[in-house]
Amino acid sequence: MINLQVNNKFGFGLMVAAVLFSILGTIGLTTKDSVDSIPTPNVPNSVFFADEPMQSNPLALLINSNAQIDWDRNDVFLVIGDADKKAQCDGLTFIEMVNQNSEVCTSRDNEFAAIGDDNQSGLSWQAKSGEYFVGIGTFSEAPEDFELNIDYEVKMTFSAVGYFVMVILFASGFTLNKYQ
């Protein structure tokens, strides 16, 4: 029977853990869900945000979270904005919202974190840490329907820093195993 010392066992455990986590980080974890019966706004080309922020990525340094959002109507666009952009859009008066000359808080506004104006290709966004809100708007005054159904998928994989941490973990285990 092989009698390994504590350092050897711990080093071997670190190396195995680093390899397993690297494999799991490469494969990734995917979650899917849907939200049904979201009421749509009737003000053309204006964004209305959700009250609650999206779940942030507190481990953004180690884990990449990529979201793909699809919806069932072509007369609706989706945006993702930070808390400052939400406050700006929520602070607009009705006259400012219906102003066709303004691009603020519309589908043409480039200050959003992500804009999805086509329900066929959807909206792709890499989740970041911080407060981000989903907003919806309609392209026309009279929407085709009063409800919106959204499907989303979030895939989480290791970032480059995550792999670097696993290499350091493996090297630490190797060092503990090699040098008693």
Question: Residue ranges of each PLM-predicted region?
Answer:
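Acidic, Ser/Thr/Pro
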Residues: I2-Q180
